[in-house]
Amino acid sequence: MCLTGVDYFSTLGYQPGIAFLAAGLLSPIATLVLVLVTLFAALPLYRRVAGASPHGQGSIAMLERLFPRWGGKVFVLILLGFATTDFIITMTLSAADAAAHFVHNPFAPHWLQSQMLITLLLLTALSAIFLRGFKEAIGIAVVLVGIYLALNAVVTTVALGEVLRHPHLIPEWKRALFAQHPTVLGMIGISLLLFPKLALGLSGFETGVAVMPLIAGTDIRQRIRNTRKLLMTAAVIMSIFLMLTSVVTTLLIKPELFAENGPANGRAMAYLAHQYLGNAFGTVYDVSTILILAFAGASAMAGLLNLIPRYLPRLGMAPEWALASRPLVLVFMAVAFFVTYMFDADVDAQGGAYATGVLVLITSAAVAVVISLGKRKRRYAYMLITAIFIYTTALNIWERPEGLKIASFFILTMISVSLVSRAMRSTELRIMSVDLSEGALDMLAEDEDQVIRVIARRPQNETAADLDRIERAVRKRYGLDPRESVYFFEVEKGDASEFDCTLVVDGERLGNNKILKARSPVVANSIAALLIELERRTGNVPHAYFKWKDGNPVANAFRFVFLGEGDAAPLTHEVLRRAVKDPDHLPVIHVS
C-alpha cells in the first residue's frame, strides 16, 4: 500500500490547491463528486482489473490480449504514450511541487528562491540515483508514507478544530456559495462539469495493480484478494483526506492566497501547517512532503523503466539499448527537463496534462473490463462506469488540451521509433528456441549421412504426386544423388505482429515425402532457425533450396517487416549471416 501511496497519497501536496483553483468555493462539492467516483467507479473497476491481471500487467496487457495482431500492437503504443505522459508528468509535477514547498519555507536560503532551478536540481538528483542503480525500497516507502499521513492527520485535525472554534466560517462560506450559485441543482451541475479538473486525485490505481507481484499470497486467488484489500484501503484513506483537506483549505485560506506565486499555491496543507502549528512543525511537514514527492518521482521513473522494456523490445519496436535502464534514464530525464521548461515548473499548469494521462489509462481499463465481461448482466454497470470516464476524459482534454498534445508527441515518437526499430531488427533470428517433435526427429534420423537437405516452400493443399514432381525438379536442377534424403519444410504464417516465438517443428509423411511443419510469425527467420538447429544437432552443414520470388523488391521488404513474408531466399541468408559468426558452420542457401 505504501508503494502505491508514494504516488497516490503524495497528491495531497497539491490536490487541495488545484481543486480550489478549479472549483473555487465549490471545491468541497466537486471533491465529493471525485470521492464518489473513486469509491463507486474507479475502485470496483480496478478490483476487476486485479482479477484479470494477477501478475501486475494492468489494463494495457488486458487490451493487448483482447485486440490481436497489429491492431492490438498499435493500441498498446497509444496507451503507452498516455502512460508515459502520466509517469513523466508525475515526475515533473512532483518535483515542481516539492520545489514550491522549499521556496515558500521561511527557513529557505534567500539565494535559492528559483522554483525552476530547484525543480531541475531535484530531477537531476533523481536521474543520478537511477544512473547509479536504484531498487524500490519498501521500507523507505513505509516510513515516508506513514510519517506523511500522520502529519496530514495532525494538520487536518488542528484545522478542523479551527473551523469549530470559528463557527461563523461555515455560514459565511454558504452565503458566498449561494451568492455565486443560487440553486443546489446548479451547484451539483457545475461540480459535475468541474470534476474532471480534479481527476488527478484518481492516480494510484494503476500503481496499485502494478505492485501485485510484491503482494503476499499463497496462490493467485489470495494475491488477488489481498490486492483488492489494498485498493479498498488506499481508496478509503485517500477519500477521507481528500474530503477533509478540501473543506479546511476552502474555509480557512483566503482565495487570493491560492493564486499563482501565492503562499498557498500548490501547498495548501503546508500553509495551514505553518499558520496553525508554527514554522518548526511546518518545516517538518515541508520536508516530509518534499521527500514523498521526490519518492513519487522515483516511483514514476521505476514505472517507466518497467513499462517500456516490458513491451517495446518484446514487440521488436525498440532498439536493443532500450533493454538497458541507464540510456532510458537519460532519455526520460531529457524529456522531463523539456516538460518542466515548457510548463515553467508551474504545478497548476501541469495538472491538466497529468489528469489526461491518468484518465485515459482508467478509461482504457474500463473498456477492457466491459469487453472481457462479454454478455454477462454485470457489464451494464461497468458500461455506465465507462461512460462516466469517457465523459470525464473528453471534457478534460477539451478544456486542458496540453495533456493530449504531450501524449500525442509521445505516441508519434513511439510509433516512429517502433517502425524504424522493427525494420532494423527484422533480420535478427527472432526464434527463441526450436522444439523438434518425436516424429520430426525420427524422420531426420533416417538421413544416412546426416547432411540435411531442406526444400523450403509455402504450405499448399498438394497431393503426394505434386510433391514428387517438385522433388524431382529440385534433384535435377541441383544434381542431387537419388539416394540423398530430401525434406520439405513448410512454415504456416501466424500472427505477423509478434516479434519472436518458440518454433515447434512436427514431422508428417505424404506418400514417400517427408514434411517438416511449423507455425511462426516470420517465415525466413524460422527457416534460418531450423537450419541452425540442424547444424547443431548433426554437426554437419545443412542445405536449403529456394525458388526466386517474383515481384517488387521494395514491396517484398515491406511484406517481410510487417507481414512476416517476402522473398525468403535472400532474407534467410541475411538472417543466417547475422546469427552465425563462423563461416564453417553457416548453412548453405541454394536459389534458382
Predicted regions and their residues:
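Helix-loop-helix junctions that connect adjacent transmembrane segments
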Residues: 146, 153-203, 398
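Membrane-interface "cap" regions at the ends of multi-pass membrane proteins
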Residues: 1-14, 63-65, 69-77, 188
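Extracellular/periplasmic helix-exit of transmembrane alpha-helices
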Residues: 157-170, 220, 233-269
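Flexible loop linkers connecting adjacent transmembrane helices
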Residues: 44-71, 96-106, 136, 172-173, ...
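Cytosolic C-terminal regulatory domains/tails of membrane transporters and channels
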Residues: 429-592
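Loop-to-transmembrane helix boundary motifs in multi-pass membrane proteins
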Residues: 69-73, 112-121, 216-241, 309-344, ...
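A generic transmembrane alpha-helix motif of multi-pass inner-membrane proteins
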Residues: 351, 357, 368-456
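Extracellular loop-to-transmembrane helix junctions
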Residues: 16-64, 71-76, 92-122, 147, ...
